[in-house]
Amino acid sequence: VSEPWLVVIDPQRIFAAPDSEWGSPLWPGAEANIATLLPRFSGRTIITRWVPPAPGRREGSWSAYMAAWPFADRDPADPLFDVLDVVRPAIQGGAVVVDAPTFGKWEQIVAVTGPAPHLVVTGVATDCCVISTVLPAADAGATISVVTDACAGSSLEHQQAALTVMGLYPPQVDLRTTEDILRSPV
């Protein structure tokens, strides 16, 4: 197994701000743990951003989805989609930033890492973009450590449900804490 990559899923204002309809109440705790992990993965960090699908490219249910959430139907350059300060030093240090108009980011991640990587996954929302990235990655042969205390769900109940589901996929997926990763990232 190759050296692990840290993946920070969607650390953006839209998912972190308390005044955002999609703001995670669990983000502050996850953010602190992400900040702790970032220096450990210098040169091997991927940061993802969710951006809305372009109006002419909304296949199938994406049109209905964007109609249901009009506050998020904005230009991808809107400050609502900006990454948060916690990841800016990593970006300045060379972290790869990938954008995707989908919940899952596996396709964009594997384009950076190559096939069958070891991923240490953090971010928001555990019950949406994190799980939608982790399960296809596991299916493709990636080894994944989901850092439970560095992920933020849309609610505590949804967080636990998503972690329970991802925990059903050993050995492809294991659930670890920030402390576990700091002791031994592999």
Question: Language-model features: where?
Answer:
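Glycine-rich, phosphate-binding/catalytic loops in enzymes
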Residues: 23-26, 63-65, 137-139
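Acidic/polar short surface loop at catalytic or gating sites that assists cofactor/ion binding
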Residues: 54-74
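Active-site flanking residues adjacent to catalytic metal/cofactor-binding acidic residues
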Residues: 9, 48, 148
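Active-site-adjacent betaalpha module
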Residues: 1-5, 33, 40-43, 69-186
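Active-site loop signature of alpha/beta-hydrolase-fold enzymes
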Residues: 14, 53, 153
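Acidic-leg catalytic submotif of subtilisin-like serine proteases
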Residues: 6-12
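A short alpha/beta connector and helix-capping loop motif
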Residues: 2, 6, 19-51
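Short acidic, Gly/Ser-rich segments with clustered Asp/Glu that frequently serve as metal-coordination loops
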Residues: 12-18
